[in-house]
Curated annotation (Swiss-Prot):
It is an enzyme of class 5 (isomerase). One of its GO terms (cellular component) is endoplasmic reticulum. This is FK506-binding protein 2A. Belongs to the FKBP-type PPIase family. FKBP2 subfamily. It comes from Rhizopus delemar (strain RA 99-880 / ATCC MYA-4621 / FGSC 9543 / NRRL 43880). It is a single-pass membrane protein. Residues 1-21 form the signal peptide. It is found in: Membrane. Keywords: Isomerase, Membrane, Rotamase, Signal, Transmembrane, Transmembrane helix.
């Protein structure tokens, strides 16, 4: 019985290790002050360059086009590995992501660029983060709430406590 429990524990532990080893990221540059962080509902502008694992030549780069990519997270417009890897990034932060095949181009790959079932390395620079719940969101909500309290209060029908009686 005890050996059965240990066996299950070790099997579970090895499974968890395999899952967490599937994707790797490292921060190359992180700003001292981090304002907004990318979240699942953010619209971000990123520069990135991608290469096949084990090769030095990049097959895709927004730096060549000199225009960062603007994308709303959570819509499935990015590779899953990139989208997962940029969560929590600050403006100005640069990360290197090692993305496994199942979160990149999978069993198909990209003909003449990425072989099937191959990991890719993506360097991502966060140019801008625009979150719907930024500071301006909360300030505007506070202003609207204050305006409601000041101007929007009407007496409830039957409540005559604040109306002066005519004599």
């Amino acid at each position: 019985m005890f050996s059965h429990v240990i066996c299950k524990f070790l099997l579970t532990l090895s499974f968890i290790t395999i899952i967490y080893a599937a994707k790797s990221e490292s921060t190359i540059n992180k700003p001292e002050k981090c304002g907004l962080k990318a979240s699942s509902s953010s619209t971000v502008r990123i520069h990135y360059r991608s290469r096949v694992w084990g090769q030095e030549e990049y097959f895709e780069s927004t730096y060549i086009r000199e225009a960062p990519l603007e994308v709303k997270l959570g819509n499935g417009n990015l590779l899953k590995g990139i989208e997962d890897g940029i969560h929590g990034m600050c403006t100005g932060e640069i990360r290197r992501l090692l993305i496994p095949p199942n979160q990149a181009y999978g069993a198909i790959g990209i003909p003449n660029l990425v072989p099937p079932n191959t990991a890719i390395v993506v360097d991502v620079e966060m140019v801008n983060v625009n979150s719907p719940f930024s500071l301006w969101f909360w300030i505007s909500g506070l202003i609207l709430f204050s305006a409601f309290l000041l101007f929007g209060r009407k007496p409830i029908k039957g409540d005559t406590s604040n109306i002066k009686k005519k004599e």
